[in-house]
Amino acid sequence: MNKDNALQGSSTRPSQGHVGYVHSIETFGSVDGPGIRYIIFLQGCPMRCLFCHNPDTWKQNKVKSMTADELLDQAERYRTYWGEKGGITISGGEALLQIDFLIELFEKAHARQINTCLDTSAQPFTRIGLWFTKFERLMKVTDTVLLDIKHIRDEEHRKLTKFTNHNILDCARYLSEIQKPVWIRHVLIPGITDNDEYLHELAAFLNTLHNIERIDILPYHTLGTYKYDELHLDYPLKGVEPPTQERIDNANKIMESALK
């Protein structure tokens, strides 16, 4: 993974439209949307997922701020690698916390004929008021959504993330209603999301949607646990091991039914 050394931050830049608060940039991503992607990770996330491997993205600090044009100018340096399907992906943290910036960024990206992809857990989603109007506008310039569903059962979702999943599943339904291309992402965690009854329940929900292009089962891992030590935080899933390849294959097989 290449990190963009040109990432610049400024808290004193004169106002030039919205600015995004950026955690990091990956210049050559191959799994975060169609083709080769330039991935911008935004800072800030309300969820506290027990398995989170990027706790350093939680606080929405403003250390690294960049304008849409600055990010797009940097991204276009890598355009020759994108091919026909590649482009930019905005991830987090939770990117929708910065929805005004996202709208400006994606509208300017489309003006430059850059493919756009939003990677989100949809925690801020609501169909009420001004926020929904903004989301509708954002979807007009979003080519693909990577929707991360943490848990299909609300009670367990609250234990896992501290938030309900009602609005998240409603976001999935809305994206189906407008036929927005969606890739589903789901972390396979032994003892939490790795049992057949649960996986069939998830597949049954996904089967009610009509816009799913791909389902990615992401095996739980412990690669980010060192960050908890650096931040003087306790890691909630200490002792939980990654799933076996057999269980990963089993989950993928069950999810195949949701794509038929």
For the regions a language model picked out, list residue spans one by one.
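N-terminal [4Fe-4S]-dependent radical SAM core
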Residues: 1-41, 47-62, 77-84
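Short cysteine/histidine-rich metal-coordination sites, predominantly Zn2+-binding motifs
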Residues: 63-73
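Conserved AdoMet/S-adenosylmethionine-binding subsite of the radical SAM
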Residues: 76-80, 84-87, 92, 96-218, ...
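Short glycine-enriched, charge-decorated loop/helix-capping segments at active-site entrances
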Residues: 56-60, 158-164, 232-240
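N-terminal/domain-start segments enriched in small and hydrophobic, helix-friendly residues
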Residues: 22, 39, 43-46, 57-59, ...
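Short, conserved loop/turn and helix-capping segments at secondary-structure boundaries
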Residues: 65, 162-165, 242-245
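Auxiliary Fe-S-binding modules of radical SAM enzymes
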Residues: 1-31, 188-260
